[in-house]
A protein has these predicted regions:
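Short terminal hydrophobic/aromatic SLiMs and anchors at protein ends
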Residues: 5-6
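Conserved alpha/beta-domain cores
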Residues: 19-268, 274-276, 288-290
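Gly/Pro- and small hydrophobic-enriched strand-loop and loop-to-helix capping segments
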Residues: 278-294
């Protein structure tokens, strides 16, 4: 089954669950209890400490790894608490959640002196834009073609581009809007059928073709670690992604000079990923706790 077919099957299976989930939690809610805010603050600080320790153990410079808060199923109030605690990049899995949360987040962050993604770019004056601290907004989950128009006004970067067909559709929409969208090529390093991403053997060719597209800025590669207990297997996938990134950069192909990011590592395997060269770790559970919904 190709990546597109796999994605479509997954979307059909999760569509009803998504509707039911959003009926049970108000994702636009902006007010949370102080105790909950403290839990999130503590979670952010623990993860930042883990990242610092992993950087040191790997002999990497402090601050070389960005912490992206994966905010799937988290409401606006919970996300604001994470940002107040030090989060500076957020990532959503589902375009539907972006649509529900974006306006409230942008408004509340504006009151705090932040700008969110590209949501205010068209209206922000130069002085205010320069003064605001930018909070990048990434899409880290799968994107259907019919949802591209909904996420482009908000997200800076789409980390889940896994085919030329999807890249071309995003590029077309971006060009029509007169914008450039950051993208990461998602690579299925584990080979697990349940995961999206292009085959590792196709990654270099796809990256070079995407880099040459107008309206897109190829920023790097993304993968999800193997769902196994064997450390060597997990590390092997991360190390291979790093080598692939290095080959893309060394090729000197058009549009690949900025292909520097390696988005790999989550709550359970971030230390391995950092030691293997990750520049972005995507963490949800260790910050917010276990999800009550899928």
């Amino acid at each position: 089954m190709c990546a597109y077919e796999t994605t479509m099957v997954g979307n059909l299976r999760t569509g009803a669950a998504m509707t039911a989930y959003m009926d049970h939690k108000d994702l636009a809610n902006e007010v949370i209890a102080q105790a909950r805010a403290q839990e999130i603050t503590d979670g952010v600080h623990r993860v930042l400490d883990r990242i610092a320790s992993a950087e040191s153990a790997a002999g990497r410079a402090a601050g070389s790894v960005q912490l992206l808060a994966a905010t799937k199923t988290r409401d606006v109030g919970e996300i604001l608490a994470a940002i107040d605690a030090g989060i500076r990049v957020i990532g959503e899995n589902r375009p539907q959640e972006i649509t529900v949360k974006a306006d409230g987040l942008a408004k509340r962050l504006g009151e705090r002196g932040y700008s969110l993604g590209v949501i205010d770019a068209a209206e922000a004056d130069t002085a205010n834009a320069a003064a605001a601290t930018h909070i990048p907004f990434h899409l880290i989950g799968q994107l259907q073609a019919n949802k591209i128009g909904k996420v482009l006004p908000v997200v800076d970067t789409i980390e889940s581009v896994d085919s030329i067909e999807l890249a071309e559709k995003i590029a077309r929409r971006a060009t029509m809007r007169g914008i450039t969208v950051g993208v990461l090529l998602e690579v299925n390093e584990s080979g697990e059928e349940s995961k999206s991403g292009c085959a590792p053997s196709h990654a270099i060719d796809l990256a070079q073709r995407i880099g040459a597209m107008g309206g897109l800025r190829l920023q790097g590669l993304m993968t999800i670690g193997a769902h196994v207990d064997d450390e060597r297997t997990i590390r092997a996938g991360f190390a291979h992604l790093r080598r692939t990134r290095d080959q893309i950069l060394a090729s000197g192909a058009e549009g690949t000079a900025d292909c520097t990011e390696l988005s790999m590592g989550m709550t359970h395997d971030m230390a391995y990923a950092i030691e293997e060269g990750s520049t972005i770790v995507r963490v949800g559970t260790a910050i917010f706790g276990e999800r009550a919904f899928i």
